[in-house]
Amino acid sequence: MSDTPQLVVHRDKELMAEAAAARLITKIVDAQSSRGSASVVLTGGRNGNGLLAALAASPARDAVDWSRLDLWWGDERFLPEGDPERNVTQAREALLDVVPLDPERVHAMPASDGP
């Protein structure tokens, strides 16, 4: 495999999200196979949430051992817990409430009304 980055163009955002989800699932499964667990840093926004929805909809999602996956956030809005504008709230709706994640391995950033 080459270390040279490749530009991959998809005809629409749905296909891009599906392709990214397929690649991410492969990377997670590979990491879990070689290291026992995997960590992923999430972001919000249309593309980030589209990726999470594509992960949730993918039949290949069953290849992931969700109990051995740590989720972190690269950014977050400093709003009250449950606010629909928080990235973690959107991630819960798109993926986290759909797959059997270990809640102890979901590392959300603090909310404005939390500890």
Feature map (PLM): residue ranges:
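N-terminal glycine-/serine-/threonine-rich phosphate-binding loop
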Residues: 1-40
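Ligand-binding beta-strand-loop-alpha-helix segment within the catalytic cores
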Residues: 2-4, 64-115
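Acidic/polar N-terminal loop/beta-strand segments that form early-domain functional surfaces
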Residues: 10, 43-45, 74
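Short beta->alpha linker loops
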Residues: 11, 46, 112-114
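Conserved active-site and cofactor/substrate-binding residues in soluble primary-metabolism enzymes
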Residues: 15, 19, 46, 50, ...
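Generic structural signal for well-ordered alpha-helical scaffold segments
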Residues: 21-29, 56, 92-96
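Residue-level signal for inorganic ion chemistry
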Residues: 24, 45, 106
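Glycine-rich N-terminal segment of FAD-binding domains in flavoprotein oxidoreductases
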Residues: 32-59
